[in-house]
Each structure stands twice: as C-alpha cells, then as structure tokens.
Amino acid sequence: MDCYTANWNPLGDSAFYRKYELYSMDWDLKEELRDCLVAAAPYGGPIALLRNPWRKEKPASARPVLEIYSASGVPLASLLWKSGPVVSLGWSAEEELLCVQEDGVVLVYGLHGDFRRHFSMGNEVLQNRVLDARIFHTEFGSGVAILTGAHRFTLSANVGDLKLRRMPEVPGLXSAPSCWTTVCQDRVAHILLAVGPDLYLLDHAACSAVTPPGLAPGVSSFLQMAVSFTYRHLALFTDTGYIWMGTASLKEKLCEFNCNIRAPPKQMVWCSRPRSKERAVVVAWERRLMVVGDAPESIQFVLDEDSYLVPELDGVRVFSRSTHEFLHEVPVASEEIFKIASMAPGALLLEAQKEYEKESQKADEYLREIQELGQLPQAVQQCIEAAGHEHWPDMQKSLLRAASFGKCFLDRFPPDSFVRMCQDLRVLNAIRDYHIGIPLTYSQYKQLTIQVLLDRLVLRRLYPLAIQICEYLRLPEVQGVSRILAHWACYKVQQKDVSDEDVARAINQKLGDTPGVSYSDIAARAYGCGRTELAIKLLEYEPRSGEQVPLLLKMKRSKLALSKAIESGDTDLVFTVLLHLKNELNRGDFFMTLRNQPMALSLYRQFCKHQELETLKDLYNQDDNHQELGSFHIRASYAAEERIEGRVAALQTAADAFYKAKNEFAAKATEDQMRLLRLQRRLEDELGGQFLDLSLHDTVTTLILSGQNKRAEQLARDFRIPDKRLWWLKLTALADLEDWEELEKFSKSKKSPIGYLPFVEICMKQHNKYEAKKYASRVGPEQKVKALLLVGDVAQAADVAIEHRNEAEMSLVLSHCTGATDGATADKIQRARAQAQKK
C-alpha cells in the first residue's frame, strides 16, 4: 500500500494529487506538438493535429495534413488540407471537428475525416480575417467565438442552430488582447478579455469593466486566463507571476498563489473533482508542469517532452509524443483506504481480505475490529467506491474482492451497488483498451451516460463492442442493440465497393425483423449516398407502407410508390401519391398510369367529384364510360346551369350518353325530365307561382292545390302516372285544402282504385270525423273493422268482427275497448269467442 501511494503528491494538508499513465503513445508523429494546431476532445475523446505551415516556412508544394487519432494514438483519419489557413481547431460535444479558417469559414469534419458541412462567422470577417478563435461548450451545444482583425468579437452559442452575435466594441482596444476566453453565466455566453491591467466582460448588449476582488497590486497585464470545466471558476495569470483564483462571476476570490515565474505559460487549466471543496489549477510551461491551489506550496512535474493539457470533468489529461497521462485529485474513498497508516473501515477491510487469502488469523482480528465499531457496511461501500476510481484492473479486483468478503458478514447489505460497479468497471475496462482508446474515468462515465458512450462507440464504428455492452447490461432492445444495428446498416450502405444485392442481403440477414429498426431510414441514407437501387431494395423489407412511400416519391419512383400505397390499403397515402403524380406527369401519362391501377382510378374519381369536375369528365371521356358521363352531365346541369335552356341542353347531352351506354331507361328518364322542365317553365309563364325544379308528383300536387285539376289530369296522362298514384296525390291535396265537397265529388267520380280506407285515414288525419264516417261505410268488408275503429265506432266494429268470425279482428276491437265505456262490447266479443271455441 505504501508503494501504491508513491505517486501521490500532497497539496496542502487536505488533498493529494496523482498522475498515472493512460497509454504509451505509438502514433509516430513527424512533427513536434508545438509545430501543430492541436485539439483534444474531453471525456477521453479523440485528438486532432494540423501542422501549421502558415507560421513556419515550408516548401511551397507541401500541403498540411490533418490527422485524427484516438486518445491512445491509434490513427482514425488522415487527409491533405486543401482549404485556407486555419486559425484554430476544436471538438464539438458530438465529437465533430470544427476547423476555423482565417476567412471566417468553419469546416466541420467527422471522426473519420469525412466532411460534414461548413458555415461562416459573418461577412465582416471576409475583410478583417480571424485572428483567434475558441470552441466552447454550453448546455445548448457547442459554440464558436472569434476575434477579428478589427479587434471585434463574434460568437455563436450553438453551431447546430447558428445565430451569430456581434459583441460590443471594447473602448480603446487598438491591438489584440493579451488573453481572452468565453464565460457562460445565467445560460448566456460572454467574452472575458484582458487589455493591459484591465478586464472587460462583453455580453450582447454592453462592454463592462470588471475587477477581480483581492488581486495583488502591481499587475500591469494578464498573460493567461482559464475557466473551469463547469464555468464556475476563473483563474488569471498575471505578469507578476501571481495566479488569482476565484468565481467566474468575479465576485469572490478563492485564493492566490505566487509561482515566481513571470514567463507566460503555454497552457493553464483547472483541475477539480465533482463535489470536492479543493480547487486547483494546472499550469504548463515548456518543460514544467505546476499544480497550484489554496496551499503555500505547489506540486511540480518535469516535462520531458512538449506536452498538451486537456481539461476534464475530474482532472486533466496530459499527452506528449510518447505518453498520455491523467492528473487528478485522489478521491476521498481511495485516500482513506490507501493513505499511510489509515485506520478507515475500508482500509481495514482490504487488509482483512488480504490476510484471509494468506490464511492468517489477522483477518479475523481486522474484521472483528470493524464489526465492533459497527462500520462494516461503510467499509464495504468504501471499497466499492474506491474500485470505481482506480484505473488498473488488478487494483479494482482487489478492492471488489474486499467488498465481496465484507458482504459475506452482513445480513442485509443491498447488492445493487456492488453489482452495478462490477458492470460499470467491466464496461470501462473494455473501452479503455489501447485499441479502443477511450480513457473515461468513472465520474466521466456517469456524467456522459451509457447512451452517449454507445453513440461514441458507433461513431468509431465499433459496432461489435457496442452490441456486447448492450447485451451485457441488458439494455432494452430498442435503446440498445436495435439502435446500434441501424447505425451499422447506415454505415454499410456507404461501402460502395460492395454490390447493392450483397449489401441489402447482408443488412436483412443481420437485422431481420429487429424491433425499433427502420429500413426506411437506412434506405434514406443509401439514397443520400447516391445508391438509389439499393434504397429500393431496402424498402422492400420495410413493413410500413407509410414509411416506404415518401422516400419512393423523393427518389422519383412515383409509380412504384403508387403500387405500395395501394397495397397498404391506406386511402390517404394513395391520395398523397396521386397528387404528387399529377404534378409530376403530363396529363396523358397521368391518366394512363391511373388506367393500370383501378383502385387509384376509383379514388381519384371520388376526389374529382368534389374538387375537379372537368378532370372527371376527361377521365370518363378517355375511358369511353358513357354511363358515368351521362350521370356527370345530369349533375352538371343542376350544379352549373341556371338558365332552363342550358339545363335542357346538358340533359340532352346526358341522354345521348345514356343511349351510347345502351341504358334506355336512363335515357328515357332524362328525356322525360327535359319535357317536365319545359312544361314547368310554361306553367310558370301561364299560371305564375313556382313550378321549376319540382318533382313530377309535386308538380301534379301543386296544380291540384291551385285548382287546376284538368291540367293535373292531363299531366298525369302525358307522363303516364298510374291511377292509384294520381288518386293518392289528389286525395292528399284536396284534404290539405280541406275542400271536402270536392273530395266527395272526386270519390264518387268513379270507383276508387285505392279503396276508401285512405279517405278515412286522410280525413281523420285532418281531424274531421264527420267526413271520415261518410267513407267508412263505403270501405270494403276486409278493411271495415279498421275503418270503424278509426272513426271511433267500437260497437259497430265489434258487430262486424263477430259477423266475420275473425279472431284477429275481434282481438283488434278488444284492444280498443276501454273498461268504462265499452264494457258491454267487450263482454259481447268474449261471448262470441267462447261460442266459436265450443264449435
């Protein structure tokens, strides 16, 4: 244990810092780091190097090379730089490389050197060029801030949603500031810059002079400044060799340190741990690394090579041509277990487990000591927590064995934390492997989340490892394996050296019907790569037509899209394709396409009936569909024509169409309608009143109501209205007029073809019982009982029913008898029924 703490360095009385090697770099750099533009992504991210030929003379023919490596030095990409001079490099939160050029254009590259997009930082930059730039991260995304040759600042807080903000001018700024950085306060990005002994804070509205509280006197300029990983703290390096540390709001001073070095440092970054009260800053010169904080002494390291610092959530990565190291504050759990002469519960439990392996009785002594103090649960938890913060698997195993050993003597210790730590460490050890090169710490891993880690493995095309992690952690398929397989398939379609058939087959064999995988998304990626035929083959595996059709339309495969939409049975989808086809094809080709798709043609006709009547007529004409064409002209005659002549002409066209369709009934009916219209116009001219657009029956009724009985009868003869129907019409009309005398004459004009019960019913409907009784006596025997009941003559109805010996009629009469007035009648019927039953 003493040996294990050999690389621990105390900073004051309450904190230790250690630096250990992550990787031995084997990237075979041809240039020194000082001769390159360098950018390293946080959270164990990749490293980008661009030899800067614009600051050092090189042969005119030589082009700079942009190289991207993993954190372990494994090459990921290398490409010749063919664009303009680059001022700064930086990584976005999505691990995209942002290259800021002098002309203000920012080029965005993927992890494997694939060009993604570009954007400009404004027109002003074209004239004044970019002097310096910073890439920073906020809760909204990754931002870019630039300093132009006019000594003005422009920034965008989110390159994914580019909104440029030109910051206010700094008064009296005639040259570039000695140092500057971005500060995020209250969810807004600011610029903090130093001009001589003065500090200025720029926001979108104003430029404010600020003064660090408690700053040592004699400062004439600030040489370097650094903001902490979480933007909560700020460090300033002055020309007097002092380092001021305080809050980023510049309202509170934390501490100050005199490093007795006035030379400006190459880099200065914060080194802090989440939930730690200690605050420290790491300062790097050419061959010296210094850790300073709220302590009278500093920690110093000698740098054998040119090195680069990468601030992290819980420490600082330091890499050079040969090594990649991690410098951080020793976590509390590790400190309590491993520091010399520690009597912490975790330290005693670790010793107990080691003695147990040696089969020594000291194991029992250590264990009893912990149990007597009631600290065994705390000891187990300390060992579990410390294991998470250890980089080397052997030490992780030792601590976890100790925790497992202690758990055996506890009845109710929840196993979740132990199991979860074992899983997390197995994942961390897998991704820390040299060939993977993602040296995440436990704190970084928890902050990043497993989903983001999987996304980063996918970005590196490490699909098998990502799938193994998903299966090991038993993540839901849609969030884990399915999502990764979908990414793999999207990458697979970009492999242009493999045939479309082979790629489609390989993707289908791997994915099958995996839930959560959208073949249409993969097909869209294939189409974006210029592989239309592959996209079509992939869409064959997509079970949802609603996902197939939009992409087929985008690929200008409209006829195939129509077939798929029809197969789906989704009428809305079919309409979508039809409207697209209508705009895409000429009229003839469009109609020809419809003729080959009966369902689509039927739906389009329905659409045209409501929206495009002329198109509907063209469809019927093209198909020689005279029956529907006739129906169309009939509807059109009433919908569009107001003049009687135009309406008759349209009906004549309809009749001709019906004759061509060999539908003589429809043709004759149409001709009858034309005759009726002409007659109605003549009646209006001669009699006045409203006749047009009345039906034949209503026309007859109107004539009767107007007293034009002869005209009504003539109309009935002309249009061959049956006698029964004419009698009904006349009966109803005369009753409505309450012309009872004329009604009686009409009833006696000849024998009624409808009988006389309707006369009784109509009179009773008009509440005229007197007239109804006149016709009740004329009703035939089979309807006599019903007629008598209608006029309320229950006794006579009973006599007729008894005379007829009709059981149904007697029951009907009984149902109309009331106890008070018709008791005798009811008894009479009952006696008749009884006599009938005896016989």
From Swiss-Prot:
Membrane topology qualifier: Peripheral membrane protein
Main location class: membrane
Keywords of the record: Cytoplasmic vesicle, Endosome, Lysosome, Membrane, Nitration, Protein transport, Transport
One Gene Ontology CC term in the entry: lysosomal membrane
GO molecular-function term, one example from the UniProt record: actin binding
UniProt key word Membrane: yes
3'-nitrotyrosine: residues carrying this PTM: 4
Compartment(s) where it occurs, according to its Swiss-Prot or TrEMBL record: Late endosome membrane; Lysosome membrane; Early endosome; Cytoplasmic vesicle, Clathrin-coated vesicle
PANTHER family xref list: VACUOLAR PROTEIN SORTING VPS16, VACUOLAR PROTEIN SORTING-ASSOCIATED PROTEIN 16 HOMOLOG
Subunit structure: Core component of at least two putative endosomal tethering complexes, the homotypic fusion and vacuole protein sorting (HOPS) complex and the class C core vacuole/endosome tethering (CORVET) complex. Their common core is composed of the class C Vps proteins VPS11, VPS16, VPS18 and VPS33A, which in HOPS further associates with VPS39 and VPS41 and in CORVET with VPS8 and TGFBRAP1. Interacts with RAB5C. Interacts with STX17, MON1B. Associates with adapter protein complex 3 (AP-3) and clathrin:AP-3 complexes.
Name of the featured protein: Vacuolar protein sorting-associated protein 16 homolog
Organism: Bos taurus
Gene encoding the protein: VPS16
